[in-house]
């Protein structure tokens, strides 16, 4: 029975690890990573979503903050067009459009 517990414990511990690495190819561009400086870019994948199906998930029952036509900078720096966001009591993550209309500049 103790062996089963040890195997389950080892499996749980290994499942909590995050591995950061890179692949080899013939690129010459250098970047700084979390772990190293001046690393040759060897494999890149854009992990930002470019399309959306219209559904946003709640995290732990808390909905996201949908900025609509506001940018994060406009919201934080006080663009009056973004004032409606000030009354949101809590949010789990922020959803910003790619090119929001109301950024740092506003009419007036």
From Swiss-Prot:
One of its GO terms (molecular function) is host cell surface receptor binding. SUPFAM superfamilies: Viral protein domain. Glycans are attached at residues 25-26, 38. Residues 1-15 form the signal peptide. Binds to sialic acid-containing receptors on the cell surface, bringing about the attachment of the virus particle to the cell. This attachment induces virion internalization of about two third of the virus particles through clathrin-dependent endocytosis and about one third through a clathrin- and caveolin-independent pathway. Plays a major role in the determination of host range restriction and virulence. Class I viral fusion protein. Major glycoprotein, comprises over 80% of the envelope proteins present in virus particle. This is Hemagglutinin. The gene is HA.
């Amino acid at each position: 029975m103790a062996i089963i517990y040890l195997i389950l414990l080892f499996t749980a511990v290994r499942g909590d690890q995050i591995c950061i690495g890179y692949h080899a190819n013939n690129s010459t561009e250098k970047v700084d990573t979390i772990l190293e400086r001046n690393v040759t870019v060897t494999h890149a994948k854009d992990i930002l979503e470019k399309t959306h199906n219209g559904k946003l998930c709640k995290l732990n029952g808390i909905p996201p903050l949908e900025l609509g036509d506001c940018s994060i900078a406009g919201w934080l720096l006080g663009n009056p067009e973004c004032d409606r966001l000030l009354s949101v009591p809590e949010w789990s993550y922020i959803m910003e459009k790619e090119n929001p209309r109301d950024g740092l500049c506003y009419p007036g």
